[in-house]
Amino acid sequence: MALDILVVDDEEDIRDLVAGVLDDEGYQTRTAAHADEALEALAARRPSLVLLDVWLQGSRLDGLELLDEIKKRDPSIPVLMISGHGNIDTAVAAIRKGATDFIEKPFEADRLLHLVARATETERLRR
């Protein structure tokens, strides 16, 4: 069974691009445009990984706040933060809040796939 990855980004083109890359590699993806949609998806089914944009414009919660909420609900879910506006302080804050890793946009598909594989290693070993 394919690992389930939830992609949370306010930019539809980024969601579609990331989901497409992951689908092509055999992952099962779901997408969410904002925090409430992401929380509904989490409640419906636990993902193997969440790819989460830091800013989430127009959302009730930004990415770091949503990261807090995800970790409150299930600390074992790995979360890979994505940002086009990130800096070292944002990356450090995300890691301190429990993110597995941090990747800046734009990124190469190979780099994304490497980080996804690393973040889901424990989940794969459980199967």
Language model segments and positions:
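His-Asp phosphorelay/catalytic-motif detector in bacterial-type signaling
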Residues: 2, 46-48, 72-78
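Two-component/phosphorelay signaling modules centered on CheY-like receiver
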Residues: 3, 11-30
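Acidic, metal-coordinating helix/loop segments flanking the phosphotransfer/catalytic sites
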Residues: 6, 31-49
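Short amphipathic alpha-helix used as the core "switch/output" element in two-component signaling
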Residues: 40, 62-76, 93
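C-terminal output helix
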Residues: 87-89, 103, 107-116
